[in-house]
């Protein structure tokens, strides 16, 4: 991931094709990104992604979330968000730990590899 930061991942057009797009409840958005999106920039920098939040996108008041960037990083962010909002206690705890980690440390290649090995429903060969 440090190579991506040095080379500027945003200069790679492939990272902008097929963005991850999903809707999120307002309270979950505030929990993850903070009041007034206080943690949004930190999450973007630490995950090498660009995250766009469109509030009140749906009639139910949900926020439309669009994530672009390297595929493994996008999937990591989406899985963290999914786990934070999970009703399963173990997933919720894992999601909160992932959230605390990304708020304080940039993701490393090892973080992404461990994540893909330890319970993600996606697998990518090297």
UniProtKB/Swiss-Prot annotation:
Residues 19-78 form the KH domain. This is KH homology domain-containing protein 1B. GO terms for molecular function: identical protein binding; RNA binding. CDD domains: FILIA_N_like (cd12795). Transmembrane segments: none annotated. Belongs to the KHDC1 family. It comes from the Eukaryota. InterPro entries: KH_dom_type_1_sf, MOEP19_KH-like. The lineage of its organism: Eukaryota, Metazoa, Chordata, Craniata, Vertebrata. GO terms for cellular component: cytoplasm. Keywords: RNA-binding. It comes from Mus musculus.
């Amino acid at each position: 991931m440090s190579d991506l930061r040095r080379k500027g991942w945003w200069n790679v057009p492939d990272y902008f094709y097929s963005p991850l797009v999903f809707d999120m409840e307002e309270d979950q958005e505030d929990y993850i990104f903070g009041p007034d999106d206080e943690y949004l920039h930190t999450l973007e920098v630490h995950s090498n992604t660009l995250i766009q939040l469109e509030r009140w996108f749906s009639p139910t008041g949900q926020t439309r979330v669009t994530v672009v960037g390297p595929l493994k990083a996008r999937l990591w962010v989406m899985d963290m968000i999914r786990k934070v909002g999970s009703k399963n206690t173990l997933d919720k705890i894992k999601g909160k730990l992932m959230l605390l980690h990304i708020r304080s440390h940039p993701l490393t290649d090892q973080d992404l590899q461990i994540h893909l090995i330890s319970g993600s429903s996606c697998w990518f060969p090297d």
